[in-house]
Amino acid sequence: MAAAEPLTAFSRWYLYAIHGYFCEVMFTAAWEFVVNFNWKFPGVTSVWALFIYGTSILIVEKMYLYLKDKCHILVRCFIYTLWTYLWEFTTGLILRQFNACPWDYSQFDFDFMGLITLEYAIPWFCASFIMEQLVIRNTLRLRFDETAEPGAPTVPVALANGHVKTD
C-alpha cells in the first residue's frame, strides 16, 4: 500500500484561501455588530480576498517552516503581522490602480493611504497566532490517500514506538 501523500501546494493554497475568506466575512460581521449594533451580522468581502489570503498564508507557511526552530512564537507572529501589513498594502495599491480595492481605511485615525491601519495591529497579530497554530500546522499534517474509499474506515497505522494508532 502506498503511503499517503501530503497535500499539494495548490491544495493548501485552496484551503488557506477559503479560511481567509471565511474569517474576513466573520470579522466584518462582528465589526458591524460592535460598531453599529447590527443584529443582522452582515459580513462582506470581495472575491479578491481568495487570492489575497490564499497566497499570503501560503507564504506565511514557508516562513513558519523556516522560522519555527529559530525564534519564539511571539517573534514569528510579529514577523507575520509585518508581512500582513506589507501584503495588504501591496495588494491594495495594485487593486486601487484598477479601481478594484475592496477596503478603505481612510476613516481610521492611524491609516496609511487608506490601505492599511495600525488599529488592526492587535487583531492581525492574534490572527497570525491562530493561523500558525491551528491552520498551517494542521493543514501540513493533512494527507491525501488516493487508494482510500470514500467513507471507508481508516486503516490503523503502526507508530514508530510500536503502538498502533486507531481513531
Swiss-Prot record:
Residue ranges crossing the lipid bilayer per the database entry: 15-35, 41-61, 73-93, 110-130
Any one Pfam family match given in the protein's UniProt record, by short name: ABC_trans_CmpB
InterPro entries, sorted: CmpB_TMEM229
Keyword terms of this UniProt record: Membrane, Transmembrane, Transmembrane helix
KW Transmembrane helix (keyword) present: yes
Transmembrane helix keyword on record: yes
Gene Ontology terms: cellular component: membrane
Superkingdom, natural source: Eukaryota
Residue ranges annotated as Cytoplasmic topological domain: 1-14, 62-72, 131-167
Residues in the Extracellular compartment per record: 36-40, 94-109
Membrane-topology annotation of the record: Multi-pass membrane protein
Record's subcellular location: Membrane
Family according to the record: Belongs to the TMEM229 family.
Protein name: Transmembrane protein 229B
